[in-house]
Structures are given as structure tokens and as C-alpha cells.
Amino acid sequence: MDVSRRQFFKICAGGMAGTTVAALGFAPKQALAQARNYKLLRAKEIRNTCTYCSVGCGLLMYSLGDGAKNAREAIYHIEGDPDHPVSRGALCPKGAGLLDYVNSENRLRYPEYRAPGSDKWQRISWEEAFSRIAKLMKADRDANFIEKNEQGVTVNRWLSTGMLCASGASNETGMLTQKFARSLGMLAVDNQARVUHGPTVASLAPTFGRGAMTNHWVDIKNANVVMVMGGNAAEAHPVGFRWAMEAKNNNDATLIVVDPRFTRTASVADIYAPIRSGTDITFLSGVLRYLIENNKINAEYVKHYTNASLLVRDDFAFEDGLFSGYDAEKRQYDKSSWNYQLDENGYAKRDETLTHPRCVWNLLKEHVSRYTPDVVENICGTPKADFLKVCEVLASTSAPDRTTTFLYALGWTQHTVGAQNIRTMAMIQLLLGNMGMAGGGVNALRGHSNIQGLTDLGLLSTSLPGYLTLPSEKQVDLQSYLEANTPKATLADQVNYWSNYPKFFVSLMKSFYGDAAQKENNWGYDWLPKWDQTYDVIKYFNMMDEGKVTGYFCQGFNPVASFPDKNKVVSCLSKLKYMVVIDPLVTETSTFWQNHGESNDVDPASIQTEVFRLPSTCFAEEDGSIANSGRWLQWHWKGQDAPGEARNDGEILAGIYHHLRELYQSEGGKGVEPLMKMSWNYKQPHEPQSDEVAKENNGYALEDLYDANGVLIAKKGQLLSSFAHLRDDGTTASSCWIYTGSWTEQGNQMANRDNSDPSGLGNTLGWAWAWPLNRRVLYNRASADINGKPWDPKRMLIQWNGSKWTGNDIPDFGNAAPGTPTGPFIMQPEGMGRLFAINKMAEGPFPEHYEPIETPLGTNPLHPNVVSNPVVRLYEQDALRMGKKEQFPYVGTTYRLTEHFHTWTKHALLNAIAQPEQFVEISETLAAAKGINNGDRVTVSSKRGFIRAVAVVTRRLKPLNVNGQQVETVGIPIHWGFEGVARKGYIANTLTPNVGDANSQTPEYKAFLVNIEKA
């Protein structure tokens, strides 16, 4: 309606007369205003899941299109799903802009090719793309494929081409990617977990048995204390964080935040304590000391459910920053002394009185005794009073009827001690008795919508689906491999569920290779690639730098923006023969060869890399499942057709794969058998359907299956309902054993939508499906005491009813009755949570404070002779690019904003408007010292390069007094680059160092040295 002010008054004055005249039939030809039709009236409603972070918020998408042959469905509205038990209809600013992402002007529509030395793209057909890529791959594979190593062991590996895998893709795409990469012999396979939550698995699995978030989003509401450290949940996971506010508002919970910045999470906290980035282990070890010294532990829990009572070998020691067994030349440990004393039966010796000097309990007490409140204040910069306040509140949850939940994210993982950061906190939860409890646990807040799923599916260099390990070349045959990976119980009468490893592995091989996998050929063991070392991204880009890599696949991954030392990344990509980018959007990686001035100053003519840019679908254009942070597998449905000629990832991979296999069939070559034996028996091999792959992940009975009593449990060809049915005799097949039960003969369990919650605990067992076996809280046997009675009846998860375990969750336990020696941590050989991690961690069985590689102190106050992590892998060329405090005196740390998601949302107009321009944050004191005013343009530099941005001078950052000096922090949001609809900016990772966590090689993005000057 277009009405002037004058017309408006005329209409109002003549309102009665006008309606009367109209009633007599003298109505105007067109009304000035009329009721608008409800815009969703004729729409088709589709349910989906948000593609951004791992809260997994529910979506309702609305599209037009009647399904006619020539009609194209098109989404025109997206909103939150009010039925979803986590999000309850809410979306964060990222989710609110999803429609702009789906319809972004930067969506790719056609396959494109960039020739060597060219400065432009040329459009090509899919056939041209598949044909050329397959020829390049075959030429490289035939030239560099290694069938046997120097010792004559069959290894079937291809090291000169690698692949990055998309954590925004579905689990079904992930499994197709796994089959694609492993059949080719690729070992340089990684996903975003390598640069974000790799330390989560590396720490939680050794401590508890599984490497995943132990509870779930809604369960946070059950906590009495919510501690957010190593993350900023209100900013990065705002809809998930509502459950922390629910705990605060309705359960009288205390919210604690420990962070270098006064964040959005801190703004609603009851207690905020500042900390220097990179010193979390000191803070948390101080908490451990406080709990022990003040006897604020759940003593019965510690005695029965942790390895506190087990005796450690006499030759284990710690002195001056190093544990026993250190080899300074190799920069690694001989870990043989990091183990238990064993009795004549091979079981660990035990002292339940906890008085033996070599029991874990007393060794732990001695180890953390150095971390006094004064030491914490000196190293962390945290005022002693603030630290003690945090300790007191945490200690209150040592009572059986109170719990703390820890929420963490990349603020803990992205350090050279990332895995040990997490382990220290996990040890606190064991002392407090908070593991397995409703409102307790260790909650890893995953960053990408399906990073949990791709980790589950083993898309990492040395992994296989279901947290199985890809064989190494030292495991020359199947027997040696199974012996190396199948643990023996450390204590008598334990579940030791990993003893079923052979069943999981053989079932995987049957799924991979079908009828070709037989007992006579060790189920196709030789066809798997065997590794000699981990080819993580830091390692692989150093190989690129040395000219040892020919090709690289980037599937839904933007390494130019995501990997450390951006200038080195661009230099490395410039040395490739070819690169294939599969993505819905334009990325800096796909255009790394273009000159964008200071932010990417390259000469296209000198870059000889062939680049293929292949347009893929986004979340809204495909069916499939993704796993949120709480391990919930949620099925989503396609809402529209992809733009232009874009195809889904599975179809793209299948196209390349079949062209490559056809070349090998006609021409022969290296490694033919592993490539051709991989099963790809889909109804449409060139376009596998999500439901087919999902059922493959779940698993089938290949013969009639009977239980120990001869009762038929599954007929041949039926889908399995439990991984307990998997066999090691070739009669079952499952691509990912932990997903068994997700799609059964009763249907797709991941599509379940019953949000009823009879217990009030938020477990909603009828919504979606959680691995393992729809269990919502891991280790929930530990929620009850040794007699089977809940520690807190109001938060009962499971209990013993006299004949079996039952309750408000699926029991994470067998049938052992209370009073038996069987421990609650069923994946561990001890059946216990580990305070002492034995030989499972790279730098020690207990956490220890080590400075970041680039330290603002130049020393380590605890042990000056061992400053940084002594087993960190640092390549010579990267070491030359490390800065010193004299030139770069300030701590740099990167982080996210709630309006953006990494570098995706700068392509979405709404998000670009919300946060349009790159900025950095500095304190008022640093601004005054450098003569910088709020809004000034500044240059932030490290030894590796520089960025320019707007300065935001804020009280959210303050200098900390550390070891006799003031330490300032420069806060650096990560969301800008030289592509997108937002204002062009510099890539934050220009500044970050190329060094990683010693266990997972996750880069140290959170603590490095910079300088800042007015531009």
C-alpha cells in the first residue's frame, strides 16, 4: 500500500462515507489496502537441522513448488522448530540468516576450471571435470602409490594426494568420503576436528573410555554449578546456552566463567575470574589441590569408580618439568614406566586404603601440591580471591546431591597442551563424583553441525569409523593388528567393552568389501592403507612446502582461512599440480591464486596449480543425518533443488570415483585391487541415496543370527538393532558400529520426533537417536552408588530394581548386580575413570603447566629448563617463524562472534550487515600506551604476517599481573577474508603459529605473540 500523509487524513475523515458508498456498489477499482494472505499458506513444510554449530537446532523450511516435472522447489522462509527439545523454536543470529546463506549470491552453480598461470575461471561440464580430475589422480597415483614398504610389508598407501572432509556434510556423505579415500590409499585425510576438537577425543577417551560429550544440551539445566571455561557459550552456542540460563533461573545454579576476556557469557555469570590465555592447567591443577587439601571430594566415588587406588610402577617419576623416560633428542617419551604394578595374574595391584605411597591418589597429591593459590595467581594472573571463590563453589558439588557441569570449546583445545587442559578438568569431575550424573559431566561444545559425526566416522589420518584405528605398517597382518588394539582387562571381572574390537573391525571390513572380504584373505586386511606416521594438516602442508604433494581435495573446507600461518598455506597450495574444491560457496581457498592486494598479494601467472571448483548442495538440498554435540543423530529432509548444476557431495565423489575406476579397468596401474574391491553396490552407483548409506552404517545380518541360547535374533538381510549382535565371523556387516541401532527393522530411529519427557530431566528418549544405543548420559552407572542406589534420587538416571538396571536413561552397563567388582566405565580395561592416564597421553599421565610456544614470559616459573611442551612437534621452517616477546610483546588470541560462523556467514547478507567490518579488541591501558583511539585503523603483526582492522577499545580486556610483569591481550575475531558480501578484510590466521597440541596436532590459535600499532 502506497499512501501519502494527505491521503491518509482524507481516508480517515471519509471513513464512514467511504464504506457506505462502497456498500452501494460504488467501490474503487482497486482498494488502497487489503488483508495480506498468510505467506506460508500454500507452502510445503520441511524439517531440517541448522548447518552451523553443533547445538543442532531444529528448522522448519518452507518452499514453493508443486512437484511437477518441470517445477523447481525453492525455499523462501526458514524458522525455528518449536517442537525441538533443545532449541524450542529459537534460532541464534546465524540461524536467523540461513535463508540468506541458502540464497547467497556467492553460491556456486556450475563446475569451473582455472588453468595453470591463468587469472580467470572458465566454465566446464561435469563430464569434463570428472574426466580431467580422474586422469590427474591416476597419473599421480600410478607414479607414487606404495604397494609394499622397504621391509616388504603390504601397505597400499598413496601419500602424494590428500583430502580435507566437510564437517557440514551428512554422516552419509562422510561414509562415502571414507570409502572413496581409503580405497585409493589416502592417508592425508582430515576434517575440521583436526583444527578444533581433536584434543577432545585425545583426552576424554583415555580418561573415561569414549571421546565425546558425556551428557547433552538440555541436561545442563539439571546442574547446580555451571562452569564455562575454555569457551564462550553465550556467544558461540547461544541457543544451547539457554539451558545454562535455565539452570541458573530455575535450579538456582551458580554460573562461573573463567576467561581472558569479559565475554557475553561472563556478563550473566555469578562469578567471573580472568586468566592469561594458555595457563588453564595451572588454574585447574590449583582446583585439584584445593579439593584434595580440603577433603572436598566424593570419597566413595573416588575409591570405587576411579583408579586412585591402583599402584603405579616404582620407576615412574616426575622431576623439573619432565616425567620419566624422556628422550631429548627424539623429543618423545619411553612410556613404559607410566603404568601399573601388576600381580601374578596380570591385574593391577590395588590399595583401597589409599595409603600406599605408589598409589595413584598419593602420586596425584604430590604432583598438584605445587599449584598453590599464590602460584595460580603468579602464572595465570587470576587474583587469588577470585580463584578461591571458584574453588569453594566447585567444592560444594562434592556432596552427592549436587553437581557441576563443565562447558568448554576451542579455548581449551587450541593450545599445544589442549588435550591436557581437558584432562585436568575431567580429573576434577572424577574427584567431585560428577561423571555419569544428570547435571554433571564433561560437555565438549562442538563447533560444526556434524563435526561429531565426521569424527565418529573416522575421517582423520589414522582413524576408521567407530573410533577404530587404521592399521599401521608395524601391524603386518590381521592378528598383530587385533592384538595391538584389543585390550586385556586390567582388573578382574570388568566389562572391558573394547574386547569386542574384532567384532567391530570384521563387521566394518564386510561392509567395506562385501563378499570379497573372506576369512581366507583376512577379511581384506591387506587392502586397507597402512600408515607409518600421522599425516595431519600441519605435517601435510610441510610436505607440500617441500614439493612432495601433487594433489589436494578440499571438500567443504577453507584451509586458506582455517589453517595457521595463512601466507605459508597459500605458498604451499601454489606448489600443487592440482586442487579440487567441492563447496556450495566461493571460498578463499578456491581463489587463493587471485591477487587481492595486501590481504592476498600473489602473482597468478606464477601459480601453476590447476584448480577445479565443483558446486555442491547445502544442508537444505539433501536428505541425511548429522550428529550434534550431545551425540544425537537427527535426520533432515531436502527442501529445494540445488541452484544451477550443483550436485550433492556423494554424487560428485561417485562421479570422480567411477571415472577413475574405469581408467584402471581399461589401463591397469598401481593399487588396482584395493580400489576395485571397495563395495559400491548402490541402486544408482553414480548417485548413492542417503537411506542406503545410513542402513549400511547401521549394519545388516548377512546370515541368520542366533543368541547363546539358540534364539533367532535377526534373519539374513535384516537390519541390526544393537552392536551386541555384531560378530567376528563374517556374518554381520556394519560401517560404523556405534551407529548400530540408528536404522532398524522398525524404521529410521534418527527421524523420531517424540519430545515427551516424563522424567523432567530432558532426556527425551523418543527424539532422534543418540549413540550408543540411544543412551543420553554416558557412564550413567556411576550415577548410582556401589549398592545401585542413585547418589541423588531427584536426578535418578538408572538404579537397580532387584533384578535389573532400569530408570530414565538407557543403562550404560551390563547385567552385573551391585556388589560385583564390575566398574561403571565399561570401555576401560580397569572399569574406572583414570586420574592417572597411564601411557595414553603424549606429554605425561598427569597434566603439567607448559607455556605456549610463543610465551610472553620467556620462561616457565615452575621449571625454567622446560618452558613449553617438551614433546611438541615443531618443524625447522616453522620454528624460524616463531616470534619472541621482545619484538611481539602482547598475547594474541582468536575467537568467534555470535553473528557469524567462521567464514561462511560473510556470504549471507543479514549476517554481513550485523557485523560488517573486521575489528580487534584491546584494553584501555594498551590503547593509551600505543596512542590508539576507539575506531582507529590498526596493524596487528606477528612473525608470520600482519592484518589491518578497526580498533575497539574496551574494558572487556584488562592487563594481568603475571610473574612480575603486565601481560596485555589482543582479541582477534576470525570471520573476515577477501571473499563474501561483507566488507573485505584480512584473514586472522595470517598471524597464528604452525604448531599443534602434542596429542592431536590441533594448532595453537589461542595463545601467540603479536604487536599492534596505529595504521
Curated annotation (Swiss-Prot):
Induction: By nitrate under anaerobic conditions. It catalyses: a quinone + formate + H(+) = a quinol + CO2. It is found in: Periplasm. Its cofactor is Mo-bis(molybdopterin guanine dinucleotide); [4Fe-4S] cluster. Pfam families: Molybdop_Fe4S4 (PF04879), Molybdopterin (PF00384), Molydop_binding (PF01568). GO terms for molecular function: 4 iron, 4 sulfur cluster binding; electron transfer activity; formate dehydrogenase (cytochrome-c-553) activity; formate dehydrogenase (NAD+) activity; formate dehydrogenase (quinone) activity; molybdenum ion binding; molybdopterin cofactor binding; selenium binding. InterPro entries: Asp_de-COase-like_dom_sf (IPR009010), Formate-DH-alph_fdnG (IPR006443), MoPterin_dinucl-bd_dom (IPR006657), Mopterin_OxRdtase (IPR006656), Mopterin_OxRdtase_4Fe-4S_dom (IPR006963), Mopterin_OxRdtase_prok_CS (IPR006655), MopterinOxRdtase_cofactor_BS (IPR027467), TAT_signal (IPR006311). Keywords: 4Fe-4S, Iron, Iron-sulfur, Metal-binding, Molybdenum, NAD, Oxidoreductase, Periplasm, Selenocysteine, Signal. Mo-bis(molybdopterin guanine dinucleotide) binds at residue 196. Binds 1 molybdenum-bis(molybdopterin guanine dinucleotide) (Mo-bis-MGD) cofactor per subunit. Residues 1-33 form the signal peptide. [4Fe-4S] cluster binds at residues 50, 53, 57, 92. It comes from the Bacteria. GO terms for cellular component: formate dehydrogenase complex; membrane; outer membrane-bounded periplasmic space. Its EC number is 1.17.5.3. Residues 43-106 form the 4Fe-4S Mo/W bis-MGD-type domain. GO terms for biological process: anaerobic electron transport chain; anaerobic respiration; formate oxidation; heme oxidation. Belongs to the prokaryotic molybdopterin-containing oxidoreductase family. Trimer of heterotrimers, consisting of subunits alpha, beta and gamma. Formate dehydrogenase allows E.coli to use formate as major electron donor during anaerobic respiration, when nitrate is used as electron acceptor. The alpha subunit FdnG contains the formate oxidation site. Electrons are transferred from formate to menaquinone in the gamma subunit (FdnI), through the 4Fe-4S clusters in the beta subunit (FdnH). Formate dehydrogenase-N is part of a system that generates proton motive force, together with the dissimilatory nitrate reductase (Nar). This is Formate dehydrogenase, nitrate-inducible, major subunit. It comes from Escherichia coli (strain K12).
